[in-house]
Amino acid sequence: FHSLVQSLPAGHLHGRTVLVGADCFPSNHFLLNGMAEAHGFTLKTVAFRQGAAHVEDEDFLNDWTPDVGLALLTWVSSTTSHRINLPQMVAHGRRMGSLIGVDITQAAGLLPFDVSAPEVDFAVSTSLKWMCGTPGAGVLYLSPRLIAHCQPELRGWFSQDNPFNWDITRFAYAPDIRRFDNGTPGVMAALASLPALDWHAAQDQAHILAHNRKLTARLIDAADDLGLPLLTPRPETKRGGSIMVRLPDALPAPQVVATLRA
């Protein structure tokens, strides 16, 4: 994500706004906050409503104005499992003329995701979470329409179409996503995650999701039995694969764990 932001055409974000929600993954916010001054953009964070645990889609849309050069959408929140209405968000972003990116980390490997329906400009993820991989392997998708306009600052011999070009006067970016490669890649994290990817490729993804829905329904029932308020939306269409509850100080954690185990 850092490489992508730095690779955008000079001036694309300067004097404009980058929009994120308060429930985006903190590392993304830390990164953008640190880049704002150097790249001349204003980082705008859509706030929570009073007492809320996730940002409402309506509030995000209201803050998404024509001055937004880039919006980073959190498909599924890491703290509540709230899932945004992605088609509605993307349609609004197109009307605003913004670049639209989506962080799919909290649902990739469980929920179906198609970069073309609706069409987003970029998507980022990791090999962790539902992907069942190891730390260190990331995912970057970039629309072919955008690739040719991006010039990554961090570049090396693998950034070229022919990585064996040693003529220092003839560097040229690869025409595709390989331009975001740089030096000799560290392959161990990717290799360590390969068994998980192979496993996913051999599974019936609809069956996995159906199994998840059965388990999460049991968790919701258990939370209701304990009188624990849900932080996660109840409708399946509005949540990812996790269930989060608010645990009152007066309720002993061991009691909650024992109930869930039962």
Residue ranges and their predicted role:
Residues 1-262:
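Pyridoxal 5′-phosphate
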